[in-house]
Amino acid sequence: VRLVGSEMCIRDSFLTTCYAENMETQQVLLRFDNPLWNLLELAGYGLLFACCLSLSGKAGAKFRRGLLVFTLGLILLLGGMLIVFGRTVPAADALSVYNAAAEWILGNKDIIHPTVSYLSYYPQQIGLMAFLELLLRLWNLTGLSAPAWHFVKLVYVCLLCVAVLFQYRSLRYLWPDDWEPVSCCYLILVCCNLPMILYSSFVYGEIPSFAMLSVGLFLLLRLLADCIPAHSVETTFPDDTRVVGTSHALSAVTVFTALGSILFLTLSVMLRKNSLILIIAVLLVLFFEALRPGRSGRACIGLMAMAVCLTITSVGVLPLVQKCYEKKAGNTLSSGVTAMSYFAMGMQESSRGCGWYNGFNIDTYDAAGMNSDAANAISRAAINERIAYFREHPGYAVNFYLHKHLSQWADGTYASRQATLATYGGRSDFLKEVYEGSLASAYIEWGNAWQNVLYLGMLLFCIATVRKRRPGNGSANAAANDDFRFRNLCLYTYTGLIAVLGGFLFHTIWEANSRYIFVYSLLLMPYCAAGIHDGLVRLAAWRSNRTLTRHSNS
């Protein structure tokens, strides 16, 4: 499944590009790419990675640490420049949530209302509102008159650095034998990820939620590595403490690591409800890791208990936050726009693209008098109508879902320009050109090239993990072919890939938007880095083996 999915992604991204030119209509366009040009771009990236690995091999840890500092500094620099010169402001849903937080601070209790409140349509946004309320209250303490959203964007830039740092630290647990060269490839990927920089100015849930995810996943990986029985652990880290149950202190560390992982993963759901997809992946991993042969009864019970706690907290965090606000306001919120209406909308045409937002969900909720049962009935009727039409026109159905898929997974910009387009003036001429001028096509091409690298690296990683062992021949590439360590990876290594697979299936039937795929692209970066490193190692081994064969024949 991993191999087929990654092959499909690289094929679609390599042959096509989806993008938007008109920032008013934001219609998603599809074009066919020049394969030769894409190969040239991939070769350029390959040369960059090869040079990076060569320098890492010569300079060792100093180069890696320097590259980490450079990467974090680059994020801070570009993110800060985007705040100063981009002047992006919240818009659409982001503005509604931001204004709700600001109005609540001013004492407007109508923010919590069963009919007239934005939150009565989208109560899942209340967690993000609580987070923004905290940031706005902190900003108000400064007494400065500048708009608070600039401060929020600065916090987001810092959170992006946190996300990168903890994802970088996770590599040590994902690939303990090869994490140093893989980390160099990862940092190069981060440095070239321009849509990620643009999203640091998007005052919404993506960046803070991903930061919480990165911390939570790091703690999860650390926990699962520590729970491995001592007799089955081989580690190259002198300070690694993977032996379980040897002391009360270690047991306390394990418990606090588990609680920390639960806390941050729960916060990610509070900030962005779609993070539940990754939570499901984590729960699957915890369940199967608990049943893994060799686990002690204590470890099995502990992992099962963690899964139960994570289920309760991730499902209950948003209702809990909502209850707190309702108690303070002395009022209640409605149940909100139904999920069924999103599924129905995902089967319909839109001016932006197949399955994209067309207002059906909120129009249906209004037409039903904000009654969830009535809205679901209307949505089910719309779904049945589309299913009947698809059956009568199978060619249209295939074309519809093909374009829906490409509009999300073949957009290398991840709708970053559309998401951060709004401004009240003051945007620099350079960034105006990036958004709507002559540099827009260059930005689209940059994003497309980066996405091709991402999918190719993921494909190489998946090929490496399914490759059958072959008997060693003592050649220079024997280590690459015979003792390929990726084949012995634990299940928890694939948590991110499982989440991406779940997201792929979910967004095939949900409302379409390439912005929703942005977080999945960040989750794929470690796997891409590992695949690129393995591909370059195999290429170097093949060249070395070919040279030896030539010399032996001569």
Per-region residue spans from a language model:
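Short, small-residue-biased leader/transition segments that mark boundaries at the very start
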Residues: V1-I10
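Membrane-interface anchor segments at the N-terminal boundary of transmembrane helices
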Residues: V28-G44, P147-Y156, H403-V500
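Extracytosolic helix-loop segments that constitute the early lumenal/periplasmic catalytic or substrate-binding loops
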Residues: L95-S120, G127, S351-G359
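Short hydrophobic/aromatic helix or loop-helix immediately within or flanking a transmembrane segment
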Residues: N99-A100, S117-A146
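Multi-pass, polyprenyl lipid-linked donor-dependent membrane glycosyltransferases
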Residues: V152-L159, C185-L220, S268-L278, Y516-S521
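Transmembrane-helix motifs of polytopic, lipid-linked glycan transferases
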Residues: L154-P176, V215, L460
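Transmembrane-helix signature of polytopic, membrane-embedded enzymes
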Residues: Q167-C192, Y494
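Membrane-proximal stem/loop segments at transmembrane-domain junctions that anchor or position
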Residues: K323-G425
